[in-house]
Amino acid sequence: MLTITVAQDGSGDFASVSEAVLAVPYACAAEIRIGPGVYREKLVCEKQDITLIGAGMESTRIVWGDGGSLPHPDGRPTHTFRSYTAFFRGIELRVRDLTIENDAGPGAKVGQAVAAYVDCSHTLFENVRLLSNQDTLFCAPLPEKEREKDGFLGPGRFAPRRPTAQYYRHCEIAGDIDFIFGGADALFEQCTIRTVNNHLPASYVTAPSGRADGLGFVFWDCDFVSDNCPAGTVFLGRPWRPTGKTAVLDCRLGAHIAPEGFSPWQSRTDSDLACFVEAGSTGAGAVARGAWVKQLDSQQAEELLRCARKLCRPE
């Protein structure tokens, strides 16, 4: 395996993460070790097998500030899928011990602001902090069709919609609107899911768009917290596409979580095809839900978690 070091003080092989990634031959497995510092760069990583390791979430930060409604160099708006701070496409991806942040600002001012756009066959994020406001983490693939012109403008617009398996462990993910979204099969274990308070009437954690026969998003043993959001104003999710799925298992929910738990997508009438399930929730936000949210018994929850680990956890 190729090993490359990045250090801003000149002691490494490169001074920027982007330069290090570009130096890796596509088919060569590589480990890039990134020293402390704020790396202000828009990262594009399209490699077959790559590992990025920082010096810790507090120490190594990759930051950029594009927003979906801000102008792009081509004269059009940037749109959601060109706003990313880091774009990953490949086969095997491992990211550890760093922060990826989009600091463009609140969605009301700059639109969607993706921190990480993840489109790899197998992904591991461990001890990673993902920070933004609207649309923080995009778990590819995209849906088959866009609903508005240029809605999918970006690196994956014409790419095949291939399944991806993504695993997030001991991560912190922060945002306010649909800040974990997409069509991946993804397992979030022992993560902190933090809703940022931008004084919105309602916020949404997930916006799944996966296949009807897919896993969707599964959260196990996670803490759902907020930056002092008003009680009952944050939904665990809403379906970005009709067959979206989110499961919340053995998680701790703050008082900011809405009593309904999940919400339909705006005024659409096909949300009854979505699947939102819950089991073992505790905390002030763990209350009786409506009929739309299925409550799993312990055996069903264990089986779902087993399937999620088999599909998403690295071997």
Predicted segments with their positions:
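Sequence-level preference for short, compositionally simple segments enriched
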Residues: 2-315
